[in-house]
Amino acid sequence: MAAKKVDVLLIGGGIMSATLGVWLRELEPTWSMQMLERLDGVALESSNGWNNAGTGHSALAELNYTPEDDNGNIKITQAVNINESFQISRQFWAWQVRNGVLKNPRSFINHTPHMSFVWGDENVAYLEKRYQALKASPLFAGMEFSTDPEQIKKWVPLMMEGRDPSQKLGATWSPLGTDMEFGEITRQFVSHLQSDQNFDLQVNSEVSDIQRNADGSWRVTYTNTKTDAEQVVDAKFVFIGAGGGALHLLQMSGVPEADDYAGFPVGGSFLINENPDVTMQHLAKAYGKASVGSPPMSVPHLDTRVLGGKRVILFGPFATFSTKFLKEGSYFDLVSSVTTSNAWPMVRVGIDEYPLVEYLAGQLMMSDDDRFAALKEYFPNAKQGEWRLWQAGQRVQIIKRDEEKGGVLRLGTEVVAAKDGSIAGLLGASPGASTAAPIMLSVLEKVFKDKVATPEWQAKLRQIVPSYGTKLNDDPEKVREEWAYTAEHLQLPTPPQIDLEALKGAGAAPAGAPVKKVPDIAL
């Protein structure tokens, strides 16, 4: 069988592969590319709008990104890093809108304030400390903090009506928040790529073999899931952006770099309300804090979503468990991913992360009434008949071999690449799609290191991402410029003013003490 030859093969038709394809189309327009997707179309797994929470993750509201150390100091480093990454995404999308790659911004990004919403003396004190700590960064300008029920009611009336007036509450509100439809971005990116004769999309195409050729390229065999016809493609560079399917494919390639990894699948479900009388009264993504005694997985949040042009409200997530690595995967995914090199790390994580096991067991035992009771903590006047339970996508958390501990559960995403850069894959879950542009930029820096260093690529990278190579957190004026530029092209509200005097007053955070390790799973 004669193999088709391409410069780049993208395995998986989600936001990651589509984003990398668009990056490469900008940087090397003559390169030939093929994309393989096992389902009937692109963006049908985790990138699909109904299969994720659609948060434009920029650490404005997610409390697990600002842990408290043993001395009571709030650590904002991770929050700043995640926000920096999201600013790269904003610039990347703004450039694509300018160039007609992405169409109407309202179809994929919508202004949705991000809030943290907590109750109880200890949690309110923590939230105020967090608010004060974030004043040291220009990236969090415009954030407001309040313990006044009347003010909080102006922000989120649904969350306040019917609430016990004696309950001690605290909330922060940021005008910089967004709701994202990553499925729409994916579809528009792939549509743009398809307009070029150097790009070929094959759907219903499942990879069955990945072998190294003598010349260093990769021979990938795939089967049409409708006809069973087998085809072969030779690629100089292979990117595995297959979500939960990426670990299997990396293992299939035989690259030793994959030996360090195992995966643990966790799903998430949400309660959904589509009644316009309710959905039009809530405009926020309001994140809570994990209850005492349970590890902060993805903490509960009550979210405005815009899906297919329609406003809906989601509440969750509730953890679910399946041995599948993909929503449309196989129940044998987990067991078939176990190898002699990753079995022990998985056992160690199971022992060390026992609170996770307890948490998942508790989540799986929840009844409809239990889930509704959790919702009422955030939306006291909710009516049970208006909500339905929806199973969202699967996430596969990274378990990585560790010399000291045997194995550790890793947060975030990791790029796993062969030493020669000829094949790379993306493992992990959070913050995921929000940071697809910077994550794929890190893939370019890892596997095309020499090209990234050329004046041609450097100039193009800075054209697409004007802040490339700089830390926005250290340059308030650049933050102001970037916000104004991206807000204009993404049709977002005028960004808040940055108070330079407040930044000076905040000063540097204390050195601090160790931060207690908390198990965390991204749903």
Curated annotation (Swiss-Prot):
Reactions accelerated catalytically: (S)-malate + a quinone = a quinol + oxaloacetate
PANTHER family, per database record: L-2-HYDROXYGLUTARATE DEHYDROGENASE, MITOCHONDRIAL
Name of the molecule in the record: Probable malate:quinone oxidoreductase
Superkingdom field: Bacteria
Pfam families: Mqo
Pathway named in the protein's UniProt entry: Carbohydrate metabolism; tricarboxylic acid cycle; oxaloacetate from (S)-malate (quinone route): step 1/1
Class of the enzyme per the UniProt entry, highest EC level: oxidoreductase
GO biological process terms held by the UniProt record: tricarboxylic acid cycle
Cofactor list: FAD
Record-annotated disulphide pairs: none
Molecular-function GO term, any one: 2-hydroxyglutarate dehydrogenase activity
Protein family membership: Belongs to the MQO family.
Assigned EC number: 1.1.5.4
Keywords carried by this UniProt record: FAD, Flavoprotein, Oxidoreductase, Tricarboxylic acid cycle
